[in-house]
Amino acid sequence: MPFSKLGRNKSQRRALLRTLMTDLIVNEQIITTESKAKELQRLADKMITLAKKGTLHTRRQAARHLFDEKINEETTVLQKLFQKLASQYLNCQGGYTRVIKTVPRRGDAAPMAIIAFA
């Protein structure tokens, strides 16, 4: 499937999506540009699908796309993904996130969007 390069090379694009995906799991909603939100939506749906399987292999696959940092004293990003979010979408077959268009950014009028878990 085609994807947006987001005006970056491969390593920069992977780092950007990794950071955005980690922030989305921690905050459950972020504001970013529309093109970044659309790319992040593809990755987020894949991460939830991996988390629903819940095996060690899928945990390691998901860890490749996330920073496993602490959210609070007892929870990390991977734990939140595999425990809270996976159980929340256990009966859903897809469409775990939604992209809502908002007003353009003030400085350069870039199209902005809110991406959140549905």
From Swiss-Prot:
InterPro entries: Ribosomal_bL17, Ribosomal_bL17_CS, Ribosomal_bL17_sf
GO molecular function: structural constituent of ribosome
BP GO annotations: translation
SUPFAM superfamilies: Prokaryotic ribosomal protein L17
UniProt cross-references to PROSITE patterns, sorted A to Z: RIBOSOMAL_L17
Keywords from the UniProt entry: Ribonucleoprotein, Ribosomal protein
One of the record's GO cellular component terms: large ribosomal subunit
Domain of life from the UniProt record: Bacteria
Similarity comment: family membership: Belongs to the bacterial ribosomal protein bL17 family.
NCBIfam families referenced in this protein's UniProt entry, alphabetically: L17
Quaternary organization: Part of the 50S ribosomal subunit. Contacts protein L32.
PANTHER family in alphabetical order: LARGE RIBOSOMAL SUBUNIT PROTEIN BL17M, RIBOSOMAL PROTEIN L17
The protein, known as: Large ribosomal subunit protein bL17
Source organism (scientific name): Phytoplasma australiense
Taxonomic lineage of the native organism: Bacteria, Bacillati, Mycoplasmatota, Mollicutes, Acholeplasmatales
